[in-house]
UniProtKB/Swiss-Prot annotation:
PANTHER family assigned to the protein according to its UniProt record, in alphabetical order: AMP-BINDING DOMAIN-CONTAINING PROTEIN-RELATED, LONG-CHAIN-FATTY-ACID--COA LIGASE
Name under which the protein is recorded: Carboxylic acid reductase
Domain commentary: The N-terminal domain likely catalyzes substrate activation by formation of an initial acyl-AMP intermediate, the central region contains the phosphopantetheine attachment site, and the C-terminal domain catalyzes the reduction by NADPH of the intermediate thioester formed from the attack of the phosphopantetheine thiol at the carbonyl carbon of acyl-AMP. Large-scale domain motions occur between the adenylation and thiolation states. Phosphopantetheine binding alters the orientation of a key Asp, resulting in a productive orientation of the bound nicotinamide.
GO molecular function, one term: NADP binding
Binding site for AMP: 300, 395, 416-417, 421, 495, 507-510, 516, 616
Organism: Nocardia iowensis
EC number: 1.2.1.-, 1.2.1.30
Cofactor note: Binds 1 phosphopantetheine covalently.
Record has Nucleotide-binding as a keyword: yes
Length: 1174
């Protein structure tokens, strides 16, 4: 039986769609319109007008329908998406464009003229398209801003471009207002995609107006609907058509590039027109039906071509409902696009859905080939809409096996596109040079990496090219422009390619020696090779990886001693053990450790072409010799992992739990069998918080039991403990609260979800109001998190207080038993200050009891008898313990930080009512309108609804908010006394040596400044004359923070108090002053005037530091300093309640919140020297 080829199946699909699908038939491009658009001499606005007139009655653009939804609990109204799209015609779209153009053009005070700049901040939508097209109509220069960019970056761009007008969605109004208040030039702020019926959107709009008005700003704030209404009654604005010989600027696309400094790629009128006229696979040839879903930002060239390429063909451009891709596949299923541009991340999401469906449907005896076909057919028809005719992938390399998988799902070729903002979106397609737009290309030698045009069998080198779509340069950056072109005018791509034949190129590598792995982590392979070469068993090592992979491999030449007396298996085990030991000693990250390796007994030499004349590894030659074997190893590892995980899912019911847990960890982390001991820790095997998240999800799939990340990474838990935890959960019969059981699904969480009856039994809740209050003053205090950075100083404060009265401090610390827990706590005070350690030990001997427990466990991990003893004897609870992780999502922090706090509440309302001191975070304010924020207001009202997303610290902030909500509920239930402390940066202890938080960003910065000896002229944006501005750094010493929390917590024997633990002064004490103090103390630090120059020199210097210093440096957080900060005077949040309480209680030497001082900064240096980091 003959099997259809993919092309035959595609042709049959096309014929069927044109015969049966009315939407597809109606979207066929018109030859007359296509010819007019492509006619020589057509200018950008003429093309747009021609398209809009030629397809006037067709549907042009579609967005998700919505309805208004009022929350019964809060009374707030929001938009709820409906499972359908609504469209407008080309005529209606162009009418909207005309209204906006007329309003702007005829504005009596600030008319917009050709050449003026308009900046847009938001996600792609019909309103966004309207504004963009209005710019085209008038000849204005569009500046699409990256919605994810830091405010400092946005300000830099707006300062450089001086736009007359800034348009923003409600979601980004805070950033827009920050830019305007920073003194940028827009005269108007237009708010688009605005629905005043939505309470949050209306609040954002009103807040923006109020903030600008309060600041005395003259910026006019109005909605796009108001602009359109004004323009509706005005004469039409003239269509901008430049003179024949004129090619004015039409668009700036800003890209950070490799330097991190925003650079505006200039698109002239002619270049911008090619986005409509192009005939590339991405844009679509003039006869291809275009129905697509636009999910890429308009600040990216692919996003713009995706939109305009479809409109130019008379198709329908639908817009994704949300920018975070949370509705992407729901949107795709509703739209059923005929074409799509994939990015690798979306391919990963499809594959994850495939794996999940495959596992869900797998049953014993199922035919895997049949199941594979069924799942892929279901994905193709339902998940992806079932009528794709063209699919393209781009923006980053896609692994070959992923490409094969996607093609098998789509039943279509997945075309591989290569381009860039500077060169144009369509330079290569399926490795073939695209002519047009490419006019010429060449390869140039890269001798430092060993790539030459004389290489055989194929020439290799950096790709340089000339193309019709290449930008003329960067806006106002002549020096940077000069760097990206050679003397013959060829654009330097920075990419190494191999020329298989004329016009057929294959991507090889980036010229930069720093390798970016697929998860976004950068590794310096030469550095890693040097680290591992220190092993007595390793003679030479070649590290191998690519941007398509998340982990590294290696080729190892063993030493003669290593080879002597060992067979292959024993040798490999010895080498693997050596690598792990060296990695641990060097504090390498898991992604920096090769997961597997080839053993080569022939050394790399000059003679065999693997070393250069100065004995450097010749990477191209090494890749040529070992590349195929290493790629096969990647394939084998992936296959082995998938097979093992599938086997585990099937066999888990018949295997001991410990065996399943160990095999799952082995498969997920790719470690050797010899390392899989029952007493091994997940983190010691190379796991980190992200891999722990995947492991947690896997264990839940296998066992049907929630295994939080905190349990996986707990230093008290070995693999056998994880197995015991799972067995206990399976046998308990009781289900602990989870994110889903409390909040349901979705991306919003509500304070109303967090009711105590979801966490605490009815009997305890019913009795809470009738139990006696704990005695005052407290004599028995329970402290969680005592071995944490702040926790240790709270421990010391309470030991000192209770020692005077004969009281007892009980600390719950993670550990396999009480002795191990006590050892962990003791080590927190052993920082190199003998006086501190002796003081602690003397107090502890008289006053301290340590229990082994875990806040994430039922009963805090304590047995019933101990729990009951605490319930009956504890007088006050201090709860700073939390899983502090700014990467993990709320779902994973829910167990330790929310359920754990609920257990604290349960203890507090059992047997006697015990006041609670709770440590929260200023991150709670992250999702609160600054105008609505009050220090002591009820968080349930101030932040009733919050968004769950994957942004930095979102999960942690939400988890601490949830803890506050639960405590508010407990207070309402029975008058439980509560004191909440929202802390910001907690700095070093003022007195005790070595006591500073090595992991926090401030310590890392001080270390990096002193170690590199360079600092910027100012960390903040300078004034118009280039002078330093008055600024403030918000932080408090750990000892004052602990003293304040303890003193105020003792007083909280009734009521509910909330304090923002901040340094609120407009005192001019900032990062700049810290550098001044360091210089005055004799540390040789050079100030660099140009901030960008400093940043790049700083990064280079940090990367060159010794390994121990580099690991403790600011390198992982360096992006925070990529651009100068706004000069903020005073604290970001109010702290009046806290300051008044501190003054009344006379806390600290000054009986007030202290100012930061030079001695504290000097102590940072001495502490880092004591810890041998400086």
């Amino acid at each position: 039986m003959a099997v259809d080829s993919p092309d035959e199946r595609l042709q049959r699909r096309i014929a069927q769609l044109f015969a049966e699908d009315e939407q597809v038939k109606a979207a066929r491009p018109l030859e007359a319109v296509s010819a007019a658009v492509s006619a020589p001499g057509m200018r950008l606005a003429q093309i747009a007008a021609t398209v809009m007139a030629g397809y006037a009655d067709r549907p042009a653009a579609g967005q998700r329908a919505f309805e208004l939804n009022t929350d019964d609990a809060t009374g707030r109204t929001s938009l709820r998406l409906l499972p359908r799209f609504e469209t407008i015609t080309y005529r209606e779209l162009w009418q909207r464009v005309g209204e906006v153009a007329a309003a702007w053009h005829h504005d009596p005070e600030n008319p917009l003229r050709a050449g003026d700049f308009v900046a847009l901040l938001g996600f792609t939508s019909i309103d966004y398209a309207t504004l963009d097209l209005a710019d085209i109509h008038l000849g204005a220069v569009t500046v699409p801003l990256q919605a994810s960019a830091a405010v400092s970056q946005l300000i830099a761009i707006l300062t450089e471009t001086s736009p007359r007008l800034l348009a923003s969605t409600p979601e980004h109004l805070d950033a827009a207002v920050e830019c305007l208040l920073a003194g940028t030039t827009p005269e108007r702020l237009v708010v688009f995609d605005y629905h005043p019926e939505d309470d949050d959107q209306r609040a954002a709009f009103e807040s923006a107006r109020r903030r600008l008005a309060d600041a005395g700003s003259l910026v006019i704030v109005e909605t796009l609907d108001a602009v359109r209404a004004r323009g509706r009654d005005l004469p039409a604005a003239p269509l901008f058509v430049p003179d024949t010989d004129d090619d004015p600027l039409a668009l700036l696309i800003y890209t950070s590039g490799s330097t991190g400094t925003p650079k505006g790629a200039m698109y002239t009128n002619r270049l911008a027109a090619t986005m409509w006229q192009g005939n590339s696979m991405l844009q679509g040839n003039s006869q291809r039906v275009g129905i697509n879903l636009n999910y890429m930002p308009m600040s990216h060239i692919a996003g713009r071509i995706s939109l305009f390429g479809v409109l130019a063909r008379g198709g329908t451009a639908y817009f994704a409902a949300k920018s975070d891709m949370s509705t992407l596949f729901e949107d795709i299923g509703l739209v059923r696009p005929t074409e799509i541009f994939f990015v690798p991340r979306v391919c990963d999401m499809v594959f994850q859905r495939y794996q999940s469906e495959l596992d869900r449907r797998s049953v014993a005896g199922a035919d895997l080939d049949t199941l594979d076909r069924e799942v892929k057919a279901d994905l193709r028809q339902n998940y992806l809409g079932g009528r794709f005719l063209v699919a393209v992938v781009g923006s980053a390399p896609l692994a070959a096996e992923m490409k094969t998988f996607m093609e098998s799902v789509l039943d279509l070729p997945l075309h591989d596109g290569y381009g860039s903002t500077e060169a144009g979106a369509s330079v290569l397609l399926d490795n073939q040079i695209q002519r047009p737009p490419v006019l010429d290309y060449k390869l140039v030698d890269v001798p430092e990496l060993g790539y030459f045009r004389t290489d055989r069998p194929h020439p290799r080198g950096e790709l340089l090219l000339k193309a019709e779509t290449t930008i003329p340069g960067y806006y106002k950056r002549p020096e940077v422009t000069a760097e990206i072109f050679d003397e013959d005018g060829f654009y330097k791509t920075g990419d190494i390619v191999a020329e298989l034949e004329h016009d057929r190129l294959v991507y090889v590598d980036r010229r930069n020696n720093v390798l970016k792995l697929s998860q976004g982590e950068f590794v310096t392979v030469a550095h890693l090779e040097a680290v591992f070469a220190s092993s007595p068993l390793i003679r030479q090592i070649f590290i191998y990886g690519s941007s398509e992979r998340s982990y590294l491999l290696a080729v190892i030449v063993p030493t003669d001693d290593a080879l002597r007396g060992r067979d292959t298996a024993t040798l490999k085990s010895a080498l693997a053990e050596s690598i792990q030991r060296i990695a641990k000693d060097a504090n390498l990250q898991p992604y920096e450790i090769p997961r597997d390796f080839l053993i080569e007994t022939e050394p790399f030499t000059i003679a065999n072409g693997l070393l250069s004349g100065i004995a450097k590894l010749l990477r191209p030659n090494l890749k040529e010799r070992y590349g195929a074997q290493l790629e096969q190893m990647y394939t084998d590892l992936a296959t082995g992992q998938a097979d093992e995980l599938l086997a585990l899912r099937r066999e888990a019911a018949d295997l001991p739990v410990l065996e399943t847990v160990s095999r799952a960890a082995k498969a997920m982390l790719g470690v050797a069998s010899a390392d899989m001991r029952p007493d091994a820790h997940f983190t010691d095997l190379g796991g980190d918080s992200l891999s722990a998240l995947s492991f947690s999800n896997l264990l839940h799939e296998i066992f049907g039991v929630e295994v939080p990340v905190g349990v996986v990474v707990s230093p008290a838990n070995e693999l056998r403990d994880l197995a015991n935890y799972i067995e206990a959960e399976r046998n308990s019969g009781a289900k602990r609260p989870t994110f889903t059981s409390v909040h349901g699904g979705g991306s919003e969480i509500r304070a109303a979800d967090l009711t105590l009856d979801k966490f605490i039994d009815a009997r305890t809740l019913a009795a809470a109001d009738s139990i006696p209050h704990a005695p005052v003053p407290a004599q028995t205090v329970l402290l969680t998190g005592a071995n944490g950075y702040l926790g240790r100083f709270l421990c010391l404060e309470w030991l000192e207080r209770l020692d005077k009265t004969g009281g007892t401090l009980i600390c719950v610390v993670r550990g396999s038993d009480a002795a191990a827990a006590r050892k962990r706590l003791d080590s927190a005070f052993d920082s190199g200050d003998p006086g501190l350690l002796e003081h602690y030990q003397q107090l502890a001997a008289r006053t301290l009891e340590v229990l082994a427990g875990d806040i994430g466990d039922p009963n805090l991990g304590l047995d019933d008898a101990t729990w009951q003893r605490l319930a009956e004897t504890v007088d006050l609870i201090v709860h700073p313990a939390a899983l502090v992780n700014h990467v993990l999502p709320y779902t994973q922090l829910f167990g330790p930080n929310v359920v754990g706090t609920a257990e604290i509440v349960r203890l507090a309302i059992t047997a006697r009512r015990k006041p609670v001191t709770y440590l929260s975070t200023v991150g709670v304010a992250d999702q609160v309108d600054p105008a609505e924020y009050q220090e002591d207001s009820d968080v349930r009202e101030m932040s009733a609804v919050r968004v769950v997303r994957e942004s930095y610290a979102n999960g942690y902030g939400n988890s601490k908010w949830a803890g506050e909500v639960l405590l508010r509920e407990a207070h309402d239930l029975c008058g439980l006394p509560v004191a909440v402390f929202r802390s910001d940066m907690i700095l070093a202890h003022s007195r005790y040596a070595g006591q500073l938080n090595v992991q926090d960003v401030f310590t890392r910065l001080i270390l990096s400044l002193v170690a590199t000896g360079i600092a910027p002229y100012s960390f903040y944006r300078t004034d118009a004359d280039g002078n330093r501005q008055r600024a403030h750094y918000d932080g408090l010493p750990a000892d004052f923070t602990a003293a304040a929390i303890t003193a105020l917590g003792i007083q909280a024997t009734e009521g509910f108090r909330t304090y923002d633990v901040l340094n609120p002064y407009d005192d001019g004490i900032s990062l700049d002053e810290f550098v001044d103090w360091l210089v005055e103390s004799g540390h040789p630090i050079q100030r660099i005037t140009d901030y960008s120059d400093w940043f790049h020199r700083f990064e280079t210097a940090i990367r060159a530091l010794p390994e121990k210093q580099r690991q403790a440096s600011v390198l992982p957080l360096l992006d925070a300093y990529r651009n100068p900060c706004p000069a903020v005077r005073g604290a970001i949040l109010p702290a009046k309640e806290f300051q008044a309480a501190v003054q009344t209680a006379k806390i600290g030497p000054e009986q007030d919140i202290p100012h930061l001082s030079a001695p504290l900064i000097d102590k940072y240096v001495s502490d880092l020297e004591l810890l041998q980091l400086l």
